[in-house]
Amino acid sequence: MDQFIQLVEASQVRNDLPDIHPGDTVKLQLKVIEGEKERLQAFEGVIISDKGMGTSKTITVRKISNGVGVERIIPLCSPNIESITVLRKGKTRRAKLSYLRKRTGKAALKVKERKVFTPSK
């Protein structure tokens, strides 16, 4: 039975998403259905946590909107995710960045940037 569950989950895991970690600043394009119309809604913020694995993996994205902190928990295998773009890689020593909730203003989104090395030819 356990092998059957793993087989079904393996077929539903999305492979088109980038490698993301807590501290990264991302821009999500989410499908929103209003009545019979469907549109894309952008949500840009810092990933403060990720949880789970496989089809049950979720991320929590936090942004400051008009001085108010807004968090969204997004399942990564959701068909409502159109795309995820990594705007900035963050350097953190924690898996959960809940300390960002206490900060206000620009400091609420401030995470050191991680240097990404690319091999030279």
Swiss-Prot record:
Disulfide bridge map: none
UniProt xrefs under InterPro entries: Ribosomal_bL19, Ribosomal_bL19_CS, Ribosomal_bL19_sf, Translation_prot_SH3-like_sf
GO cellular component, one term: cytosolic large ribosomal subunit
Coiled coil (UniProt feature): none
Gene Ontology molecular function, alphabetical: structural constituent of ribosome
UniProt xrefs under SUPFAM superfamilies: Translation proteins SH3-like domain
GO terms classed as biological process: translation
Pfam families in UniProt: Ribosomal_L19 (PF01245)
Function comment: This protein is located at the 30S-50S ribosomal subunit interface and may play a role in the structure and function of the aminoacyl-tRNA binding site.
Protein name listed in UniProt: Large ribosomal subunit protein bL19
Originating species: Chlorobium phaeobacteroides (strain BS1)
